[in-house]
């Protein structure tokens, strides 16, 4: 959430400082660019931080809390055939729960894609519909 006290002044541009009250030829003489009368012309006056001349300031234009789709996104992880070879025994059932128990995938993961890298020597039973096999892995399983 954006807070008023968290806002920072934008870094000043590298520009020559304005010399005020140094005669009419300077362009900033007499009233020192403050105009005639009013609060702004008096000494001791300072504009409030974030003030943009009466328009709606940035910290009020920007929504304080937005919406992120991250909570609802499906968490998909990739796992290689080489890693499956190391983890599972021959004839073992491969499911999301089995992968989570062995701490191969994160507990938030809702889908797994198996990618061909290395050989898959073992005959595995694919239990879960959430486990997607790449084309290379499918052809490798059919060959085994």
UniProtKB/Swiss-Prot annotation:
Record has Membrane as a keyword: no
Keyword presence, Phosphoprotein: no
Stretches the record annotates as Disordered: 1-49
Gene3D superfamilies: 3.100.10.10
Lineage top rank: taxon: Bacteria
InterPro entries: Ribosomal_uL15, Ribosomal_uL15/eL18, Ribosomal_uL15/eL18_sf, Ribosomal_uL15_bac-type
GO molecular function: rRNA binding; structural constituent of ribosome
Keyword annotations from UniProtKB, A to Z: Ribonucleoprotein, Ribosomal protein, RNA-binding, rRNA-binding
GO biological process: translation
GO cellular component: cytosolic large ribosomal subunit
NCBIfam families, alphabetized: rplO_bact
The protein's assembly and partners: Part of the 50S ribosomal subunit.
Family stated for the protein in its record: Belongs to the universal ribosomal protein uL15 family.
Described function: Binds to the 23S rRNA.
Name of the protein described by the UniProt record: Large ribosomal subunit protein uL15
Species this chain originates from: Chlamydia trachomatis serovar A (strain ATCC VR-571B / DSM 19440 / HAR-13)
Gene name linked to the record: rplO
């Amino acid at each position: 959430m954006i807070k008023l006290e968290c806002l920072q002044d934008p870094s000043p541009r590298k520009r020559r400082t304005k010399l005020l009250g140094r005669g009419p030829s300077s362009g900033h003489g007499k009233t020192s660019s403050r105009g005639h009368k009013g609060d702004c012309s008096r000494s001791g006056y300072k504009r409030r931080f974030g003030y943009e001349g009466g328009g709606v300031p940035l910290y009020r234009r920007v929504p304080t809390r937005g919406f992120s789709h991250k909570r609802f996104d499906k968490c998909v992880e990739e796992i290689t055939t080489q890693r499956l070879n190391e983890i599972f025994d021959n004839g073992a059932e491969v499911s999301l729960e089995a992968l989570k128990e062995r701490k191969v995938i994160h507990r938030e993961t809702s889908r797994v894609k198996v990618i061909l890298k290395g050989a898959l020597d073992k005959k595995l039973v694919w239990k879960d519909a959430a486990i997607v096999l790449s084309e290379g892995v499918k052809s490798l399983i059919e060959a085994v």
